[in-house]
C-alpha cells in the first residue's frame, strides 16, 4: 500500500477531521433523512467556503453558548447529494471526485444557492462534458435559473447540432409545452442552419450559404 505524501496529508486534513468527527459543532440533514443520519460538520469550515453559511452562523440562535449541537436541514438536497456536497467542501477543491460528479446537477444548484462559486464552475464543466441527446434540453432549462451564459450557449449549440433527432423526441414535446419561449429560440437558430444538398453536384449548403459551383444554381436543393 502506497504511503501518502506530505501534500496528500495536507490536502486531506479537513476530510480526516470530518471523518473522525473531531470537535463537531453543527449537523447537516437532507430533506429525505432523519436526525440519526445527519452529517457531522464544522461551522468554521462551512463559513470559510460559503458567505451564506457564514451569515447564517452569525445569527443569534447559532451564537448562543450551549453544548447542544444544532441541526440544519438543507431541504434542496437528498442525503447522498448532501454527502457529496460536504465531501467537496472538505476537499482541496482541485477537482471533483467520482462521487461528486455523480451529483453534478444538484450540486450545481446548491453551489449557486450557497455561493460556492468554484464548485459551481466545476459542476458546470462536468455538465457540459456530459451533454447528450437525453439531457441537453434539461441543461438548457437549468441554465436559465439563474441565467448561466456558458451553460446556456453550450446547451443551445448541442441542441442546434442535433435538432433533427431532438425535435422528433417525446422529451421535446414536453419541453415545448413547458418552455415555449426557449422552444421558439431553438427553432429560430435551427432554421438558420438547416442543411440542403444539391441534386446536381451533391454538395451541402446552409440556407444562408453560397453556391459552391455554377451547377448548384441549376440543381435542386433538398433538405437533408
Curated annotation (Swiss-Prot):
It comes from the Eukaryota. CDD domains: BTB_POZ_ZBTB_KLHL-like. It holds the Pfam family BTB. Pathway: Protein modification; protein ubiquitination. InterPro entries: At1g01640-like (IPR044784), BTB/POZ_dom (IPR000210), SKP1/BTB/POZ_sf (IPR011333). GO terms for biological process: protein ubiquitination. Residues 24-98 form the BTB domain. Keywords: Ubl conjugation pathway. Interacts with CUL3A. May act as a substrate-specific adapter of an E3 ubiquitin-protein ligase complex (CUL3-RBX1-BTB) which mediates the ubiquitination and subsequent proteasomal degradation of target proteins. The BTB/POZ-like domain may mediate the interaction with some component of ubiquitin ligase complexes. This is BTB/POZ domain-containing protein At5g48510. The lineage of its organism: Eukaryota, Viridiplantae, Streptophyta, Embryophyta, Tracheophyta.
Amino acid at each position: 500500500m502506497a504511503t501518502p505524501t506530505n501534500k496528500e496529508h495536507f490536502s486531506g486534513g479537513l476530510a480526516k477531521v470530518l471523518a473522525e468527527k473531531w470537535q463537531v459543532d453543527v449537523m447537516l440533514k437532507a430533506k429525505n433523512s432523519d436526525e440519526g443520519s445527519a452529517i457531522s460538520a464544522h461551522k468554521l469550515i462551512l463559513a470559510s467556503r460559503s458567505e451564506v453559511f457564514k451569515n447564517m452562523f452569525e445569527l443569534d440562535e447559532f451564537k448562543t453558548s450551549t453544548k447542544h449541537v444544532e441541526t440544519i436541514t438543507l431541504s434542496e438536497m437528498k442525503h447522498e447529494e448532501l454527502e457529496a456536497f460536504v465531501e467537496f467542501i472538505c476537499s482541496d477543491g482541485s477537482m471533483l471526485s467520482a462521487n461528486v460528479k455523480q451529483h453534478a446537477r444538484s450540486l450545481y444548484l446548491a453551489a449557486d444557492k450557497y455561493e460556492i462559486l468554484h464548485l459551481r464552475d466545476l459542476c458546470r464543466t462536468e455538465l457540459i462534458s456530459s451533454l447528450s441527446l437525453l439531457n441537453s434540453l434539461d441543461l438548457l432549462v437549468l441554465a436559465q435559473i439563474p441565467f448561466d451564459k456558458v451553460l446556456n450557449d453550450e446547451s443551445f449549440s448541442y441542441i442546434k447540432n442535433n435538432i433533427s433527432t431532438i425535435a422528433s423526441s417525446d422529451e421535446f414535446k414536453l419541453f415545448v409545452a413547458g418552455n415555449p419561449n426557449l422552444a421558439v429560440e431553438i427553432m429560430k437558430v435551427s432554421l438558420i442552419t438547416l442543411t440542403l444538398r444539391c441534386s446536381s453536384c451533391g454538395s451541402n449548403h446552409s440556407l444562408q450559404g453560397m453556391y459552391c459551383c455554377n451547377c448548384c444554381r441549376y440543381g435542386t436543393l433538398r433538405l437533408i
